[in-house]
Amino acid sequence: MKNKEKYTLSPEVGSVDYNNLPKELFKKSKIDAESLHDQAFETKPVSYLRGALMRFAKNKASVIAFFIIAVIILYAIIVPLASPKSYVNSVEYPNGFQDPYFSYALPYNKIFKGSGFWDGTEVKSGYSQSDYNILSYDDSNHNPIVNVVSSDVNEIRIGPRVNRFTSYTLRTDSYAIGNKVITVKPSEYEKLVSYEQERGIYQSKGSIMKPFVDSATYLKEYRDEMAQDLLGISYSEITSADQSTKTTIDNVIDSMTNYYNQHADIYYKLSAKTSSGEYSQNSFSIIFSADGAPETIYQEDSEGKLVYSAYNTGVYTVRVDYFDYFVFHNGFEPYYLFGANASGQDIFLRLASGARFSLLLGVGISLINIIIGIIWGAIAGYYGGRTDLVMERITDIISAIPSIIILTICSIQFTNNVALRGAIGEAGVYVLAFLVAFVYSGWIGVAGTTRMQFYRFKGQEYVLASRTLGAKDRRLIFKHILPNAVGTLVTSSVLMIPGVIFSESSLSYLGIINFTTSGLSSIGSLLNEGQAAGLQNHPHMLLFPCVIISLLMICFNLFGNGLRDAFNTSLRGSEN
């Protein structure tokens, strides 16, 4: 057998002397001795992190949650940088972009324009004839009525008289806010005139600047018409004998004056005379010209020309179609993807800024708590004994004080500290108070988990073997014990982020802390604004912040579960 051939004992051999076996009892084996050796691995070894990634990728729910979180993070980063509303004049908008004229504007998406869904329109019922007239006869460039959904004629019988009135259901455009009287600097006025002249719309139909409305002059004329109709004389000729008629005229004119003041967009003549020939103080009808258009009451100068502007004390007063003026002044259309709040701020932009602030706050506080908790728990769990006993009693004392009390104390003390407010600002004071309150006891949970894991693994054979070979405490803690506890720690750490976000949102929603007054916005402050606006009247203000915070809570939970399984060393090999 010098040639390394393999022989096996024949199975037919019976009882033989095994000390003296003859050669003929052996036969040649079919196994080649040269092939009896270890074979090289055909695949590369899987590292710890790669194995964790492979295990994480197998959890589809966690992968989807990760991408949703990534989208929200990108949304929070990109939108404040890309939105033109972020780059408006800081002198004109010291607290960021806002326009009260677009208060509670509805969500608008160009993709759905004209569909009745997410296009800035809404359907409302209960419009009276006068309401319909005000909206229908509008001299702005954008009529607020999209279409008439329905109109119902109702009757009310009072004795022998039957009063008929029409009730309209209309779809209106929340961005068609009509004409507004504003003041502009001379330089801005010159730019506006040049802008209109370049486009050939200066003082013509479709122009941004509209003629002033002079209701006072018309009402003075109408007062004389009433006196002439009732008494056959002018108003100034009325004597004390006709005092009751004069009182009636005064009451009607006062009512019409209030009506014009309440509806500044009315540019046409109104009549208080009813079909029965009496004068009403409550309902007014439009006076139409022969061509069917309302008779206007535009202001005219001494030459009979329409007045489009007035200069006084260094500024121009103009009446403009506000939507078109906004585009001219700011360079972009005043559309709000998620709608606007009571101050006319863009919810889409504020929600991105709020999500960014909430995420940074959550990640920052969680990171600090994780570092403190791991160090504290590692020392207590590794050394145990009296060290652990003392550290646990300190932890018990700290955890006995609620964080809300710490937050209240810090808010009061930091706010009253003039030097601190001057150094970090009002916003910094609130952030610092929140940071101290949640770092004060937020690390205790991580410390307890770390301590438990160290008690679990410090007595394992591989740790004892490393200690026998002379490994120092630092190497045992960070090289051998801590990596095996990473799975559990990662899960609790990741779930800490949505916990901080939810705590901040809850406190802001309840009004305990208010970042809005300091110029900051968070998801919680947006929820508080939505709750104050009312779900029934302005549901969009509450809907979108609720969706974002719900996605964050659910996705961080699923993401944390996926990381727990990925970093669990007992599952190593399950990815194959």
What are these regions (language model features)?
Residues 57-62, 356:
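Short, solvent-exposed loop/edge-beta patches enriched in aromatic
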Residues 7-9, 14-41, 48, 73-75, ...:
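Aromatic-enriched hydrophobic runs in primary sequence
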Residues 61-82, 374, 550:
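Short, strongly hydrophobic transmembrane alpha-helices
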Residues 45, 60, 548, 552:
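Aromatic-acidic/polar surface patches that form glycan- and anion
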Residues 60-70, 340-576:
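Alpha-helical transmembrane segments of integral membrane proteins
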Residues 1-58, 78-343, 576:
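Membrane-topology segments of multi-pass transport proteins
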